[in-house]
Every structure is written in C-alpha cells, then in structure tokens.
C-alpha cells in the first residue's frame, strides 16, 4: 500500500510544504484538488469561495510551479483530481513543460469530470498521459453506474498502453474493489481485449508509475 497527498482545503490547498512532507514520508501520488476543485463545487452547487483554484486570469497559478518541481524531483505521479477538462489541458501542458514525467488524468469518464473521448485522445496524442478508467461512478443515493462500455471505447480509441484499469472501489456506492476488478477484467476479455493487454493495464502501468 502506498500513500498520497490530495491538495484540498484541508491540506492547505496548493501547499508545497505539505507536498514535500508527504513525499519525504513516501507518498507516490500528488492529487490536485478533488472535493475542493472549482469544477467539483460548481457541479455540486457548493460554496465557490472555498474552491482551491489552479487557474487564475487564464493562467496556471504560481503555487503549482513549486509543486511540479517537487513531483519532478521525487519522480512521483501527478493526478488531476476533479478538475474540469479545460483545467486539465492547461495543467497537463504546464506540468509537462516543468518536466513532470508521470501524469494520470483521473477518471475522465466520471460525470464530475466529464471529459469527451475526443479530448482524451488528444491528451494522449499530445502529452502521452495515462487515463485512469474506473469500474463505476457513484451517482448518489446509494447508486452507481457501470463505466465498462465507456472504458472499452476509450481503450480502443486511445490505445491500451495509455489506459489504466482502476475501480474507485473506496466509494461507498460502488462495489468492493475485488468484485469490481473481476467483473472489469472479464468484461474486457469478453470484448476482445487480449490477456497481454489486460495485464499491461492492470500491472505494468502501475509498476512504472510507482517505480516498483
């Protein structure tokens, strides 16, 4: 099991000191805001005054540059959290320009992020990022929606080497991760994805991202 740091308000937002402390303790992933992302708050009709902003006046906020440098120096993963597609494009470009090598776009298929397949293809082609595609997305009220058809489409369009199989099984509405992973793998196998490709998406990508 590996740790991570999520840059929500509770962590002080875009707090480079918290990032550095987490990395020195062994964190392997730095997530940009999730619950505190402007996009998340807008879609949940929350208090926008509490948003952790990553873009200001059309530009990446300066605080991100220090965080990018730490991520680069420790050779860990940058996760995009619950940013909007527009924010993701700007952040990914800035992170690549800063030398960040490992970038994961977090569950782009989830309605909270809502990234089109065309944008996912473009991100892969332009920046060679990893797309995290989860088994299901919580819909509220104890319900979830399967992402498997969307995920298969993304694998076919973007290429299996840029799609990471994940579950989001920690969400209370979603199935337990082990059941979700079994169904996910079986679905891919039933729809023409080879054993070698499945292994790559469930093992090799993660091994490389975590420096195992």
What are the residue ranges of the model-derived segments?
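Active-site beta-loop-alpha junctions enriched in small/polar residues
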Residues: 4-10, 33-37, 83, 108-111, ...
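Divalent metal-coordination and catalytic microenvironments
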Residues: 1, 30, 78, 131, ...
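Extended substrate/RNA-proximal surfaces in nucleic-acid metabolism proteins
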Residues: 8-106
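Charged helix-capping and loop-helix junction motifs
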Residues: 16, 61, 116-120, 144-152, ...
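Mid-to-C-terminal alpha-helical segments outside catalytic/metal-binding sites
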Residues: 180-212
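Short acidic/histidine-rich active-site segments
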Residues: 160-177
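Catalytic pocket-lining loop regions of alpha/beta-barrel enzymes
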Residues: 69, 74-146, 164
């Amino acid at each position: 099991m590996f740790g991570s740091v999520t840059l929500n308000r509770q962590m002080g937002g875009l707090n480079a000191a918290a990032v550095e402390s987490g990395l020195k303790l062994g964190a392997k992933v730095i997530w940009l805001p999730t619950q505190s992302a402007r996009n998340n708050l807008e879609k949940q009709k929350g208090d926008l005054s509490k948003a952790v902003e990553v873009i200001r006046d059309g530009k990446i906020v300066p605080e991100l540059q220090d965080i990018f440098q730490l991520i680069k120096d420790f050779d860990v993963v940058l996760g995009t959290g619950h940013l909007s597609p527009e924010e993701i494009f700007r952040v990914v470009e800035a992170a690549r320009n800063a030398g960040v090598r490992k970038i994961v776009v977090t569950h782009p298929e989830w309605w909270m992020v809502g990234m089109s397949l065309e944008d996912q293809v473009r991100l892969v082609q332009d920046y060679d990022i990893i797309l995290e595609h989860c088994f299901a997305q919580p819909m509220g009220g104890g319900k979830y929606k399967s992402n498997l058809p969307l995920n298969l489409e993304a694998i076919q369009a973007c290429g299996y080497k840029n799609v990471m199989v994940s579950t989001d099984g920690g969400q209370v509405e979603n199935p337990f991760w082990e059941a979700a992973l079994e169904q996910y793998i079986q679905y891919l196998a039933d729809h023409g994805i080879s054993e070698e490709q499945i292994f790559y998406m469930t093992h090799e990508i993660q091994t490389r991202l975590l420096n195992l």
